[in-house]
């Protein structure tokens, strides 16, 4: 995807001056041996017992109660919703279809906004008219709403699921953002922590695993928290973390055998960061094969970008691109040693993919994955040609290439290839047709990357092209690009609401990959520089267990 893979250096001069910091983690995860990551029978039995207790609690709590809404919200935010997907879906479907208090006059803002958000988040077309009762005749929010912190927080979260044309939610987002910032100044309690976290990244843009890790620390400070839920969430987090550590041990061994640090020292060496990225999308235990393959693919795509972007000569890149286009391992002798080493690693991973997908009768999908990797290389080559010739493309030319060189399409197709879920050929072709949700996500990932990278020496972006073509200031260009991103998010939201054009599996993949970019590029390039923010995030999810 945009951030981890593509640096997108359409250079403004002859220089290709990029120096990346060394691998932060090196062989750290080799310490997680099979003995350390083994899960005891007693732990598995305790996990199962607690899970069934929560399932019973879900089934026994009435759908038409506020308690059910709060229970579902807590389960999802604690990162354990994947155990109860059917129960949660059925409850929210029932609430959407039959709940008699949905439009009750005595509904308070906290409950109304929570109900709306849970239903909309589940994909049901909840009407935003439910919030009109909180607005006066002039269209302004009533005065008593202004000081209801919990109500405002829930309304803020709900308004982030807005689609085009929902003016009341657009107004709510602006209103709630300002009021919440003002009301929580100087506050240090659990609620204020939740507000500050939400204002940084709302639920609609939060990755499940990382969001759960952060939410647990706030949830346990809440006096009304459910101890059963919290204990199970912590146990589940720790057990799944052991699975991730075991996989990282294997990936680290693969990385050491490649020895890219020696053979391709110019490239970003980020295998653990790539794994962290994939955990953001597919953290559940059943996706182990996909996580391993996708980590290798992202890592190789990142190195591929650096070969084109900062090291290869135009003559080398021309032959290199032809060999990848033909997927011709017999022609690798034409390449310099570092490119031969790279090509062998790339071709080997796709052989591994073919073997693994053959076991689950999904071999047909591998060709789609290869084609997107080839297309990614073609776009990198186009950008390299622009850089060598000092050509400055138009905004239209730039986006035609940059939306693909972001790597987002390649990663979407490769991920849907490697997961166990069945994805039909018709569904692959639908994705490749670039439907609205794909186009919107491509736009978000590319432009988020461009905003984060703006000002980097030698790097051109959508901001530069917009300024040049429209004769506007830097501030105006930033505002316009930010507006395009906001509009694209509404497209994403709309496509996730019934009637939907694709399965939940596909939509989740598309949305979660987009969320990864929001995380990594919300205020800096946290992949290119992974020594601070990203390192801390990785520690919280993949290294440090929770204390139970």
From Swiss-Prot:
Functional description taken from the UniProt entry: Sesquiterpene synthase that catalyzes the formation of sesquiterpenes and sesquiterpenoid alcohols. Converts farnesyl diphosphate (FPP) to beta-caryophyllene. Can use geranyl diphosphate (GPP) to produce myrcene, limonene and camphene.
CDD domains hit by this protein: Terpene_cyclase_plant_C1
UniProt domain comment: The Asp-Asp-Xaa-Xaa-Asp/Glu (DDXXD/E) motif is important for the catalytic activity, presumably through binding to Mg(2+).
Annotated source species: Lavandula angustifolia
Cofactor: Mg(2+)
UniProt-annotated binding residues for Mg(2+) 1: 305, 309
Organism lineage: Eukaryota, Viridiplantae, Streptophyta, Embryophyta, Tracheophyta
Residues noted as binding Mg(2+) 2 in the record, renumbered to the chain: 305, 309
Chain positions recorded as Mg(2+) 3 binding sites: 449, 457
Protein name as annotated: Beta-caryophyllene synthase
Record-listed (2E,6E)-farnesyl diphosphate binding positions: 268, 305, 309, 446, 449
Pfam families assigned: Terpene_synth, Terpene_synth_C
GO biological process per UniProt: beta-caryophyllene biosynthetic process; diterpenoid biosynthetic process
Reactions this protein catalyses: (2E,6E)-farnesyl diphosphate = (-)-(E)-beta-caryophyllene + diphosphate
Molecular function GO terms recorded: (-)-E-beta-caryophyllene synthase activity; magnesium ion binding
